[in-house]
Amino acid sequence: GWMLFTALRAGIDIRTDCPTVDLVVEEGKVTGVIARQGGKEVRIGATKGVLLNAGGFARNAEMRKQFGPQPSFTEWTVANPGDTGEMLQTVMKLGAATHGLDRAIWTIASRQPNGNLGIHANELAKPHLIVVDKHGKRFTNESCSYMETGQNIYKAGAVPCWAIMDSRHRAKYAWALTPPRYTPAEWITSG
């Protein structure tokens, strides 16, 4: 959006399909990056600093185990395939301060019978549905934000948990990519 527009207007060099491989450090300061461009490693210098938009580590099992609540598996994420944390690890080795590594965007997902993940950003807040733990106990307010719901799942030790919905919910609301008024037979047979 605006950041790209402003950068282009200012004549800043924008490179796509050019992942950062490493940082160039001179006298304790980051002065550029080593990037892969066109199959070759190239050095790109910086005169005023390096701005990193490194993403997270949703697809890095070791970092999930080190920093996040458990249980946690990379198979549970729909984050982009490049969300692996290498650049974060690189800057941490240089002594960069970090904060909030135990946090995540807790978008609620369910495993579909075909193995795919269904994403549920807003479905839990709809009427005629509750979320329960393995004992059938309700442990969260389904109308809270998906971030709070994710935190509540871990606070309650409710991994895994289940969404229980009645026919009124199915008649009015989608569930992931499944439209209302249609409940696949395999949902019933698979539990």
Per-range role (PLM):
Residues G1-D13, V131, R138, W175:
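Conserved N-terminal/central alpha/beta ligand/cofactor-binding core
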Residues R9, Q37-N114, G118:
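Glycine-rich loop(s) and the adjacent beta-strand/alpha-helix scaffold that form part
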Residues T16-V30:
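A conserved short coil-to-beta-strand element within the FAD-binding core of flavoproteins
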Residues V21, G38-K40, G49, G56-A58, ...:
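Short, glycine-/Ser/Thr-/acidic-enriched flexible segments
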Residues V25, R36, D133:
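Short, acidic, Ser/Thr-enriched surface-loop or helix-capping motifs
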Residues V33, I44-A46, T140-E142:
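Short capping micro-motif at the N-terminus of alpha-helices
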Residues L88-T90, A97-G191:
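An anion/pyrophosphate-binding glycine-rich loop and adjacent beta-alpha core
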